[in-house]
Amino acid sequence: MSNNNGLIIGIDLGTTNSCVSVMEGAQKVVIENPEGKRTTPSVVSYKNGEIIVGDAAKRQMLTNPNTIVSIKRLMGTSKKVKINDKGVEKELTPEEVSASILSYLKDYAEKKTGQKISRAVITVPAYFNDAERQATKTAGKIAGLTVERIINEPTAAALAYGIDKGHREMKVLVYDLGGGTFDVSLLDIADGTFEVMATAGDNRLGGDDWDNKIIEWIIAEIKKDHPSLDLKSDKMAMQRLKEAAERAKIELSAQLETLISLPFIAVTPEGPVNAELTLSRAKFEELTKDLLERTRNPIADVLKEAKVDPSQVDEILLVGGSTRMPAVQKLVESMIPNKAPNRTINPDEVVAIGAAVQGGVLRGDVKDILLLDVTPLTLAIETLGGVATPIIKRNTTIPVSKSQIFSTAQDNQESVDVSIYQGERPMARENKSLGTFSLGGIQPAPKGKPQIEITFNIDANGILNVKAKDLTTGKENSITISNSSELDENEIQRMIRDAEANKERDAIVKQRIEMRYEGEGIVNTINEILGSKEAEALPAQEKASLTKIVDGINGALKAEKWDELKEQIDGFKKWRDDMSKKYGGGEAPAEPK
């Protein structure tokens, strides 16, 4: 039977863009945001005490220094981002910023579905460690979501693809290159069971790095004519370069060269600096060759780990917008010869769809599906000599529980420290420390005699619990490994209250921001009309009407009179409609987007 405790939405919380999906009966539906788009920029802006998310925040990137991008790269760390809003400095955790994105996705999903939503499945890169997974769950909690499951992005993609393939048995390789992370997973799909055979990846590699290579090239080209110019210290210039680089990367996926035009990118004592550069696909691929090569070994690693020959791979799924780059597709095809990547899936949406499918499984709406994922990295404890002794090895199917017996290193030792590490290096210090706890009350005895049982338990979310038990006395202690920047419960609850308290105000601010951009766009449109040759045919009365609208919009914007601004915007729309009827029903000037 279906569990009717509300919908469970599927969320792909991406570095660059995020996406939300839901199962409506047997249909997998990607939910559009208020801008009518199926993905939302993972951008958060802070202005006058308000929080702006998505497209509206992205439009402020050039003008608002309190705009945060790629926050996913900081998840699971103790790093914070600083903003200065209205002269007040504030430090924000990655969880808090991510929660604003999740809250925005949740809110528009509620409006589109007409239902209250409090449950979600959220995806993470397969190579996210324990702290990063915990941080994602915390972000969900701050956003008012019960995170029912954390699943790996490549696994979600395979789930979205394979659910409609019936009982066909196949091995599917998922190559997932997102904005900030990279994963490769190999799955065996048969009779509704999705088993991850192996996974590999790089949490510090993504489309942002390709953008940065273009930025470096642009700066170097400009420096040829302006050697003393320091663009890197100019935040606004760097943001323009970032936008130009991202646009060039996208265009070079479809064409052999692109023009990068940056008028007034800087001002020197000699005057303004204008840059107009042509970047070819060949040059772009040369600049980014080292990045592409970093994705080669993980493919080989998963095939080797799973003991699968490339010829045995039945399907290749390319996930993440960066996989649209031709060089990426060529590399994958060279690694898996005679098997073209599947191009029927949308690389930007498939992960969120897979998360929604998993939500359907948890609700009981989707039947006969079993998902068997793996832990991406070895989990170990530090033993005598600083050695990392594995308890659960990488690519072990989860959920899983494993135990080993250890003892004391010194005579009459009455307590032991259990230090937990994650990684593949032989020495503990070379891996990532996840946490430490102590077990006391051990009866004095010669070294090596007490028996201490260490148990590692990983749940379906990939989150680790470690228990130490003295088998002689029965005493035990345990720790749930959590984010190294863990927020205490009081702080989490404060953030939840803040988000709820500001909900109405944030909605008003967002509406005003959208009106501001609409008004500014109309002013630009009218100025273009009045400055065009066609304006000569306009009667003086019409020109006067347009000039009056421009003055009215500019005045309302300057005074922040929102009702007056709405009247002026409506006035332009009426003028446009009247003109359309007057001149025979032809197309009116387009309203700016």
From Swiss-Prot:
Lineage, top-rank taxon, reads Bacteria
Residues with the modification Phosphothreonine, per the entry, are T181
Alphabetically sorted, this entry's keywords are: ATP-binding, Chaperone, Nucleotide-binding, Phosphoprotein, Stress response
Q: What induces it?
A: By stress conditions e.g. heat shock.
Enumerate the Pfam families for this protein: HSP70
This entry's Gene Ontology molecular function terms read:
ATP binding; ATP-dependent protein folding chaperone; unfolded protein binding
Describe the family membership recorded for this protein in Swiss-Prot or TrEMBL: Belongs to the heat shock protein 70 family.
Role played: Acts as a chaperone.
What name is this protein filed under? Chaperone protein DnaK
Please name the source species: Mycoplasmoides gallisepticum (strain R(low / passage 15 / clone 2)) (Mycoplasma gallisepticum)
Taxonomic lineage from the root = Bacteria, Bacillati, Mycoplasmatota, Mycoplasmoidales, Mycoplasmoidaceae
Its gene name is: dnaK
